[in-house]
């Protein structure tokens, strides 16, 4: 998931609420340490949804450095995940805290309220208009956000584009997140 730090509204004005929120480290850590994507992954792999988990930007076996070391193992080591392996039950990044972000959420809400951010923060995700599969998947993603972060903190809003994600959404920065 890629976060947009300069989101704009449909009139081209900066979305100060989102932009201030996403600039806050505790807010971003809530996304990273708190969102359980298991049901979202199940849209792709119903039997073993956590096989879809990817915390390393690429999948294992794709990239190697000049010493022959596999890229994802190097990243896992840097992230402190080098001792972690697929267990089929819990996403790797949720294991340390069990997905409990109550303290981070409280910290983020206090820090952000102090600078004028209002809650819930709206996170905009766009799908192609008329694509029922994309809508079903986005609805599951919205539920993951709701169950993991709470509707009092962040609400995922699903928007649509007609023909070009790049031209209609990404280029004009309407999105909060891209996948």
Where are these regions (language model features)?
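Generic recognition of flexible, low-complexity loop/linker segments
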Residues: 17-18, 107-114, 164-174
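Append "and occasionally in soluble cytosolic enzymes with long acidic Gly/Pro-rich linkers
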Residues: 21-148
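Short, solvent-exposed polar/charged micro-motifs at secondary-structure junctions
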Residues: 2, 133-136, 165-170
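Short, flexible loop/turn elements at secondary-structure junctions
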Residues: 5-7, 35, 60-62, 125-129, ...
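Short helix-loop capping/hinge motifs at secondary-structure junctions, enriched
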Residues: 7-27
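Periplasmic binding protein-like
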Residues: 146-179
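Extracellular/periplasmic solute-recognition and catalytic clefts
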Residues: 1-11, 38, 42-44
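Intrinsically disordered, low-complexity cationic segments
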Residues: 1, 121-124, 174
């Amino acid at each position: 998931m890629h976060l947009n730090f300069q989101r704009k509204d449909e009139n081209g004005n900066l979305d100060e609420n989102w932009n201030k929120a996403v600039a806050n480290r505790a807010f971003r850590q809530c996304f990273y340490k708190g969102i359980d994507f298991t049901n979202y992954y199940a849209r792709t792999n119903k039997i073993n949804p956590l096989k879809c988990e990817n915390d390393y930007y690429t999948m294992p076996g794709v990239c190697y450095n000049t010493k022959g070391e596999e890229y994802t193992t190097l990243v896992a080591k840097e992230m402190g995940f080098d001792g972690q392996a697929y267990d089929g039950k819990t996403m790797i990044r949720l294991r340390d805290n069990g997905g409990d972000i109550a303290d981070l959420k409280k910290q983020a809400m206090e820090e952000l309220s102090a600078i004028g951010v209002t809650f819930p923060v709206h996170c905009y995700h766009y799908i192609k208009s008329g694509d029922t599969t994309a809508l079903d998947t986005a609805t599951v993603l919205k539920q993951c956000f709701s169950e993991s972060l709470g509707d009092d903190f962040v609400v995922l809003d699903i928007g649509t584009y007609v023909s070009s994600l790049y031209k209609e959404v990404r280029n004009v920065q309407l999105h909060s997140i891209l996948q």
